[in-house]
UniProtKB/Swiss-Prot annotation:
One of its GO terms (cellular component) is cytoplasm. One of its GO terms (biological process) is tetrahydrofolate biosynthetic process. SUPFAM superfamilies: Tetrahydrobiopterin biosynthesis enzymes-like (SSF55620). GO terms for molecular function: GTP binding; GTP cyclohydrolase I activity; zinc ion binding. Pathway: Cofactor biosynthesis; 7,8-dihydroneopterin triphosphate biosynthesis; 7,8-dihydroneopterin triphosphate from GTP: step 1/1. The gene is folE. It holds the Pfam family GTP_cyclohydroI. It comes from Serratia proteamaculans (strain 568). Keywords: GTP-binding, Hydrolase, Metal-binding, Nucleotide-binding, One-carbon metabolism, Zinc. This is GTP cyclohydrolase 1. Zn(2+) binds at residues 109, 112, 180. It catalyses: GTP + H2O = 7,8-dihydroneopterin 3'-triphosphate + formate + H(+).
């Protein structure tokens, strides 16, 4: 079994404590077993849809889907894939807001297993530590690579950064298109959903909150 990084263990524990972890079973199968079993079940699903898997266009589809699920779009279910995080002592005593805008994310709606496509804005006010900026993007991507609801995704990113940075002063906003709305059901091709999660000064200070929300509006504009 792959050992987890200290950061992965801390983040997972923080989410569990707050009831924000993705619902997971206790049993963990190894990667190749998961791929094999998903392939078997996907073969059965496609056959039930009356698709001919002897056709060369379809023959490898169950294998491709199994590989995609385990290695790519649901890789964030495995904390062994949690990004390597570099947290640096805040020697410069930075105490102003650090904001990363237009973080592209692609996730999967856990209700219908179709795409959620959007962008995130993440901000924090450093305390004792700062984080490599690309690590913020990687944390967003990690939690996006799961079956998700947008509200939980937003809060998971917030708690992960609060845990790693040792400060509550974190804010996250996500603006996304849900293909369970766009491609099925009501089939509304133009609507988008915005979720925001605020901590520390972003919640208690009106000025700090407004500064963050201006950055969000700039992104949406």
């Amino acid at each position: 079994m792959t050992s987890l990084s200290k950061e992965a263990v801390l983040v997972h524990a923080a989410l569990e404590e707050r009831g924000l972890e993705t619902p997971l079973r206790g049993e963990v199968l190894d990667r190749e077993t998961r791929k094999r079993r998903i392939k078997e079940h996907m073969t059965e699903i496609m056959q039930l849809l009356n698709l001919d898997l002897s056709d060369d266009s379809l023959a490898e589809t169950p294998h491709r889907i199994a590989k995609m699920y385990v290695d790519e779009i649901f890789s964030g279910l495995d904390y062994a894939n949690f990004p390597k995080i570099t947290v640096i002592e805040n020697k410069m005593k930075v105490d102003e807001m650090v904001t990363v805008r237009d973080i592209t994310l692609t996730s999967t709606c856990e209700h219908h297993f179709v795409t959620i496509d959007g962008k995130a804005t993440v901000a924090y006010i450093p305390k004792d530590a700062v984080i490599g900026l690309s690590k913020i993007n990687r944390i967003v991507q990690f939690f996006s690579q799961r079956p998700q609801v947008q509200e939980r995704l937003t809060q998971q990113i917030l708690v992960a950064l609060q845990t790693l940075l040792g400060t509550n002063n974190v804010a996250v906003s996500i603006d996304a298109v849900h293909y369970c709305v766009k491609a099925r059901g009501i089939r509304d091709a133009t609507s988008a959903t915005t979720t925001t999660s605020l901590g520390g000064l972003f919640k208690s200070s009106q000025n700090t909150r407004q500064e963050f929300l201006r950055a969000v509006r700039h992104h949406q504009g």
